[in-house]
């Protein structure tokens, strides 16, 4: 027998036949969702694009294509009851604890607008938003009333000590409905960690990336992002499933 170098006998490893399409889909999703890491992209590929791929393969392609993995956010402090007790009020089921908060942004003419965000702490779903130049306590009540009709009444609602939330009108109205109010310590936004996390994602993924020329445009884009957050965006705390999978919308158009 003729001697032959072992190096010439090595099997040439060819990339899978679907590698090109998978790479294309990963790049498309990474472009659309600039703050998502490869694990969330993997979840989107499997949930929405019909792939059955593990995160290690996606990570390999991710790094080969020079895509940047976003830095992890620091862990937030624990949430405590505002009576100073050492028992953390954890949401244990849907509608157990809601929380709400305000955000501020501007249109291109420099005028400020406010965003009221309301979430279910257990499901992580954003239940509703209000986007206006100015939001009064009565408008907060009106939005909560709308959500109570549609979703039912929560047992608790958590907020900071902003005047819109501590106003007598809203506190009395909630008390009449049997909703217990939880107020965080002043200057301690981490105690309202669930809604602060949501607000941070909206800031990163939308507000810091968009320019709003009018209030109407801001309303449309913010509501569009809310629906995508609820119905499409994989959430790590929910096993990389969206907060409201029962209303999931397909990303793939036919």
Model region roles, listed by residue range:
Residues 37, 125-127, 151-156:
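Short, surface-exposed connector motifs at secondary-structure boundaries
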Residues 111, 129-151, 163:
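Active-site beta-loop-alpha junctions of metal-dependent nucleic acid enzymes
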Residues 96-127, 133-135:
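An active-site-proximal beta-strand-loop segment
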Residues 1-4, 169, 176, 193, ...:
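Generic alpha-helical secondary structure signal
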Residues 72-74, 157-161, 176-194, 210-215:
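RNase H-like polynucleotidyl transferase catalytic core
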Residues 2-97, 188, 242-251:
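Basic, flexible linker segments flanking DNA-binding modules
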Residues 177-179, 201-254:
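C-terminal domain-tail junction helix/linker
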Residues 144, 151-167, 240-244:
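Acidic/histidine-rich, metal-coordinating catalytic segments
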